[in-house]
């Protein structure tokens, strides 16, 4: 399992490594090429999770470490079977 995590989520460091291959990246640097084979994303509002980012990817779950969710295209995720939460 591959998980990409926004590097501004310091409390997660070390928590998922026993279970997954984890990559910590600045939110603005999370690109379609990087998420292509990722199973999950843990993001903040800087990462726009829409068709441009997710099309053709293996992502099945997006967790947002934010109060709002306006950076997640819920309609697109629903059509693709991508679960998300914030």
Question: Model-found features: residue ranges?
Answer:
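Phosphate/diphosphate ligand-binding glycine-rich loop within oxidoreductases
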Residues: 40-86
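N-terminal glycine-/charge-rich "phosphate-binding" loop or analogous flexible N-terminal tail
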Residues: 1-38
């Amino acid at each position: 399992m591959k998980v990409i995590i926004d590097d501004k989520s310091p409390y997660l460091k070390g928590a998922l490594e026993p279970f997954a291959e984890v990559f910590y990246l600045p939110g603005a640097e999370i690109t379609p090429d990087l998420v292509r084979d990722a199973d999950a994303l843990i993001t903040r509002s800087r990462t726009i999770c829409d068709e441009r980012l997710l099309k053709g990817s293996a992502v099945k779950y997006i967790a947002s470490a934010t109060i709002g969710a306006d950076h997640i295209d819920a309609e697109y995720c629903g059509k693709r079977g991508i679960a998300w939460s914030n």
